[in-house]
Amino acid sequence: MKNFLKTFISVAHCAALLAFWSFAVAPVFAGDTTNASFVEPYDYASPKLLTATLYAIGSDRQDVLYTFRRTATRSNNIVHVERQFIATNGSIAAVEKIVYDSGRLVSYEMQEFQAQVSGAIRIAPDPKNPARQQLIISYGPGLTPPPGAAESLPPDTVIDDTLYPFMLAHWDDLMRGKAVKFHFVSLDRKRTYEFRLVKTAEFVQDHQTVEQIKMEAVSFLVAEFINPIILTVEKASPHHILSYLGRTTPRVKKGKAWKYLDAETVYHWS
């Protein structure tokens, strides 16, 4: 049971988180499980480039594990996002490719070249009821994701790249001390789990006021085995995520095996 719980959240999902760089699934999925977006759809094409550095936790930002690069391009209503995790030798350790249409998630694909695994997510209309949306998740060995099984799209479903817009949509509630729940996609378990965001502190860092927001599993059983993700966010608009501690996409080699990685991810906003 412990091993099952320790592995249920995969690299590209909790931290997925991710490199949680923070720009997300259609910002928020409506409670009726349709693929709804903000009144004004979030612009996933901005910024065109975002970078980050992933450090070993506890190294005082000295031990670099990976660098992160997110690029976005727009063609009419379609936005293509590519998120690369680059090893210290310059090789690409993992890549995530995401497609949005009019601010709504269409597809997500992850390839982890070191561990030789891949996964994919699709949001599509239910053939039997096109007014409702389906979530199709696949994951397996090899660099080509296998076919996935469809299920109803849960309300407020979030992936790595959609966490930031979801957080923005609920910013006022978070600042009032309310916990905001959502469903986070776990590729390797091919399902979603319920998580919540909650503000835990406010302090001054590098001459600016920041908020500390914790992402944690709602289930006590799951939370016992999964460390929370700790986000440090600008208090002032646009509330950029400056850094986070927790699970990220590329793995780290321990002995002969590639293990899931918790790291400190620091974003470089220009």
Which functions belong to the PLM regions below?
Residues 31-103, 108-126, 181-270:
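Acidic, serine/threonine-rich low-complexity disordered tracts
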Residues 45-47, 132-210:
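Solvent-exposed helix/loop surface patches that form functional interfaces
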Residues 1-9:
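N-terminal secretory signal peptides that target proteins for export/translocation
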Residues 11-26:
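Bacterial N-terminal signal peptides
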Residues 15, 135-136, 214:
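Compositionally biased, intrinsically disordered low-complexity segments enriched
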